[in-house]
């Protein structure tokens, strides 16, 4: 399972935070538990721009590997490619995670996405999240 966590600009940039908000550890834990209820044998691969925060704040109930974010800059496509190799996805309100889930070839993939993509809940996102993905 690719568990993608976006924090840096969504947390540290007041304008980004005001518009996007961010997915907290509660969402990530609930999403992980949801996938485990369907596939109890999975392992998690955490991809994030803030691995230290993830290591301190996520206690996933399955084997977990924290993937180093040394693929910044020109190597971002390698990071994205590694994400697409996962079978299932927990994504935040981030297009990077969205593209990883979208591009993954597993036809039976489970994708969990946040119910609210933006702070302003009146923004329509029905065309953003495919019907087969689970909103949480």
Regions found by a protein language model. Give the residues of each.
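Core catalytic architecture of nucleotide-activated donor-dependent transferases building glycoconjugates
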Residues: 1-74, 107
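Tryptophan-centered motif/residue detector
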Residues: 27, 53-57, 98-102, 116-117, ...
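Structural signal for conserved beta-strand scaffold positions within catalytic alpha/beta enzyme cores
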Residues: 66-68, 113, 135
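A donor-sugar binding/catalytic signature common to diverse glycosyltransferases
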Residues: 76-123
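Leloir-type glycosyltransferase catalytic cores
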Residues: 120-136
